[in-house]
């Protein structure tokens, strides 16, 4: 059965949430994850809802009903006016599944999988251009995680084959899950040097929260860490290009960034492990459990704005960026079941930048006092960027 919220449309999607997504100014949404994708069968989310298989989701210890799949999400993207960045499973699957999904979503009618899409109600190709080849494959928490050399070989094979199918795709390799991974830097060098010819982007992921910093002042200066992350990965991308005497730059896709109180999740995981022990257990896993529903404050909004400014200041290298997540889970939008949807504090800086920051980005020269931080030394008290829209002859100063 479709959700019964008063604002639900004919596909079961809440229109109050759709309106907030439009207000937020999101232009591209990464789907279906995230850790979730590494054990996901894309076919499970196609066809009649009543015939879709129910699976266990290893990433979040929950039951996945597959009520929403790629066809449904494509329809939602049309309602919200967003582009889809599609991630493929490199944990339990790989080359064959990626090619079959590509044929299903983008193929012209006349082949088996494209015709299956047509039978499922999507007559036109979805024309999804940007594809993530796996998610956080360096992370030991990831289903099917790999060593740098293992992933480099795998992504090279998959990217090569996908570009044989569609040369115009934009392909994103997994970079480091954070700048604090033990393999940070060496992972990027291994992957990009091996697979340079067929890659267009490398991903970056970073989350921040006050309890994870040495002080409130250090937390407010989190963008310093993001800047170092960007410059390090950009240098690795340049090394790979030079090693190949290449003809294209590998851009950065900062496709997970934001504020996440990750210590709460780490505690939840530890409790699960303690409860399960070493015994076999047969209890059912919950459906759509309430996880990672962080409630944000004013300091979080300041950090969100500063991170957005940092991404804009480095838009020559960061060509795509996606804050994580969108609704309920570490999100700017909250939606209660059978209740209202509302905006969190972090909604506002993102929405303002998305609405007004267009055109060319400039780093302004602003004289401001310095503040002392334990992690980054002296940093400017003000963080800012200027954008200029030549078409409309309008400029914007973003500052926190």
Regions found by a protein language model. Give the residues of each.
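Active-site His/acidic residue clusters
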Residues: 205-221, 269
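Non-catalytic accessory regions flanking glycosidase/transglycosidase catalytic cores in CAZymes
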Residues: 1-185, 192-201, 226-400
């Amino acid at each position: 059965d479709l959700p019964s919220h008063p604002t639900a449309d004919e596909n079961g999607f809440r229109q109050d949430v759709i309106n907030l997504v439009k207000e937020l100014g999101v232009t591209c949404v990464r789907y279906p994850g995230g850790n979730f994708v590494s054990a996901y069968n894309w076919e499970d989310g196609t066809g009649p809802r009543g015939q879709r298989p129910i699976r266990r989701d290893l990433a979040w210890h929950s039951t996945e009903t597959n009520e929403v799949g790629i066809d449904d999400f494509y329809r939602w993207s049309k309602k919200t006016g967003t582009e889809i960045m599609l991630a493929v499973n490199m944990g339990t699957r790989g080359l064959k599944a990626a090619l079959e999904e590509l044929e299903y979503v983008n193929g012209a009618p006349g082949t088996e999988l494209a015709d299956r899409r047509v039978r499922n109600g999507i007559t036109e190709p979805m024309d999804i251009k940007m594809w993530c080849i796996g998610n956080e494959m360096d992370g030991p928490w990831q289903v099917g995680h790999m060593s740098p050399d293992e992933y480099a070989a795998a992504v090279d094979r998959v990217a090569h084959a996908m570009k044989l199918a569609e040369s115009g795709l934009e392909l994103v390799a997994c970079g480091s899950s954070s700048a604090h991974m033990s393999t940070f830097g060496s992972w990027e060098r291994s992957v990009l040097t091996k697979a340079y010819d067929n890659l267009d982007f490398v991903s970056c992921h970073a989350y921040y929260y006050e309890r994870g910093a040495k002080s409130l002042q250090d937390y407010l200066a989190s963008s310093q860490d993001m800047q170092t992350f960007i410059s390090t990965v950009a240098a690795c991308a340049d090394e790979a290009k030079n090693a190949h005497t290449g003809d294209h730059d590998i851009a950065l896709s900062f496709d997970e960034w934001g504020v996440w109180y990750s210590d709460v999740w780490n505690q939840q995981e530890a409790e699960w492990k303690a409860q399960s022990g070493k015994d076999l257990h047969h209890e059912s896993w919950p459906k759509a459990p309430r996880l990672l529903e962080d409630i944000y404050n004013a300091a979080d909004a300041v950090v969100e704005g500063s991170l957005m400014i940092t991404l804009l200041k480095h838009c020559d290298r960061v060509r795509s960026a996606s804050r994580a997540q969108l609704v309920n889970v570490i999100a700017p939008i909250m939606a209660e079941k059978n209740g209202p949807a509302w905006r969190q504090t972090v909604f506002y800086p993102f929405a303002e930048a998305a609405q007004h920051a267009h055109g060319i980005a400039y780093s302004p020269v602003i004289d401001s006092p310095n503040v002392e931080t334990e992690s980054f030394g002296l940093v400017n008290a003000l963080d800012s960027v200027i954008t200029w829209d030549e078409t409309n002859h309008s400029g914007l100063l973003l500052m926190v």
